[in-house]
Amino acid sequence: MNSRLQEIRARQTLRRKLLAQQLGAESADSIGAVLNSKDEQREIAETRETSRASYDTSATVSKRKMPEEGEADEEVIEECKDAVEPQKEEENLPYREEIYKDSSTFLKGTQSLNPHNDYCQHFVDTGHRPQNFIRDVGLADRFEEYPKLRELIRLKDELISKSNTPPMYLQADLESFDLRELKSEFDVILLEPPLEEYFRETGIAANEKWWTWEDIMKLDIEGIAGSRAFVFLWCGSGEGLDFGRMCLRKWGFRRSEDICWIKTNKDNPGKTKTLDPKAIFQRTKEHCLMGIKGTVHRSTDGDFIHANVDIDLIITEEPEIGNIEKPVEIFHIIEHFCLGRRRLHLFGRDSTIRPGWLTVGPTLTNSNFNSETYASYFNTPNSPLTGCTEEIERLRPKTPPPKSDRGFGASRGGGRGGPSAGRGERGRERNRGSFRGDRGNFRGRGGPHRGVFAPR
């Protein structure tokens, strides 16, 4: 414990020295003086002088004994009374808390009690949102400090680019178009519906018809989804979260993730949108719900999914007013996660056409989709999957093996009563033929499969 405490103190001392060098302070103890602005330093100096002067005066008065009326003249008595009365008035004044109103020397990395580390106050002063200061958010520099993960991303991008189908697109009115006419099942379906709230927040008239959640729910997604598939549904920042979950349930999907898009305003601080009449605060994020259909386990279905390659956050600059396009990073997240090659993008636009995807939307200006040509890309049994290389399999994050496979089962809990006494018997339970508690193919308390089905 002492060594740990010494290590923490040493790191704290080093941190203060580095801050002193960055701020140009003489020593680590003088950081506080550098953080204060000139006006604050002047106020502090005046306060110190005033308090020192009042202290000296009170000390002088306290040392001088109040003369009695018979021992001194009236002038001395009045002088002592005038010195004591202001001191009593100051004691009776209510305490006023100092309110911090300036963040001109806003600094990251300082103590949390320091007001200069107040991101909310900095937003009030400058208009810069707190998320503007999150580091390494771009695709290029996100994994600079993680060479293995950076190499994994590079290898996966190369494999995806080689296995992608040519970009195909179809101009269609999704209100009347039957999705079953695509004559294909899809592993991934991305929906980007033009919601009413997008146009309500921007205050600009819609160039295209916006969709209600009742209309979105009528889409025949369940008819084109594969036996194991994923759906990604952009549902805005407000009431769409609840309606989005309802859509997933209606289509036969289970909600498994919530990808959050955090919008920064580095290029245009202080920019405000038209406030949603249903909202109290400005909304600076959107949600993309991910649903799963079928049985997919990251520990056993490595041929179909690679989990934990990306994070569930997208941090990019907020688009201009009137632009409802979503960040392109959502495509990278989907392609890195799901190894299925049959990808469908609904409500796509000309700017979202990309290799490996079939884009369908009412605002597309052209079409090149042919159902027979598209189906020919997936004729062989393994052709619907991108596949995987040995190097990618070695680098990708995996589920830790169960304790029984690591040799912990039989030795756990072996105690004083011998190898077969106490809880040490838990690891041997699976070697027994049957026992009275083995009901419904579930193991009892002593088995390693408590609460789950026995492996097939």
Swiss-Prot record:
This is N(6)-adenosine-methyltransferase non-catalytic subunit METTL14. It holds the Pfam family MT-A70. Residues 135-136, 237-238, 255-258, 278-287, 308-312 are annotated as: Interaction with METTL3. One of its GO terms (biological process) is spermatogenesis. GO terms for molecular function: mRNA binding; mRNA m(6)A methyltransferase activity. Residues 245-254, 297-298 are annotated as: Positively charged region required for RNA-binding. The keyword DNA damage does not apply. Residues 52-61 have a biased composition (Polar residues). It comes from Xenopus tropicalis (Western clawed frog). PANTHER family: N6-ADENOSINE-METHYLTRANSFERASE NON-CATALYTIC SUBUNIT (PTHR13107:SF0). PROSITE patterns: MT_A70 (PS51143), SAM_MTA70L_2 (PS51592). Signal peptide: none annotated. The METTL3-METTL14 heterodimer forms a N6-methyltransferase complex that methylates adenosine residues at the N(6) position of some mRNAs and regulates the circadian clock, differentiation of embryonic stem cells and cortical neurogenesis. In the heterodimer formed with mettl3, mettl14 constitutes the RNA-binding scaffold that recognizes the substrate rather than the catalytic core. N6-methyladenosine (m6A), which takes place at the 5'-[AG]GAC-3' consensus sites of some mRNAs, plays a role in mRNA stability and processing. Residues 410-421 have a biased composition (Gly residues). Belongs to the MT-A70-like family. It comes from the Eukaryota. The record marks Y146, D242, R245, R298 as: Interaction with METTL3. Residues 39-51, 423-441 have a biased composition (Basic and acidic residues). Heterodimer; heterodimerizes with mettl3 to form an antiparallel heterodimer that constitutes an active methyltransferase. Component of the WMM complex, a N6-methyltransferase complex composed of a catalytic subcomplex, named MAC, and of an associated subcomplex, named MACOM. The MAC subcomplex is composed of mettl3 and mettl14. The keyword Cytoplasm does not apply. Disulfide bonds: none annotated. It is found in: Nucleus. InterPro entries: METTL14-like (IPR045123), MT-A70-like (IPR007757). Keywords: Differentiation, Nucleus, RNA-binding, Spermatogenesis. Residues 39-74, 395-456 are annotated as: Disordered.
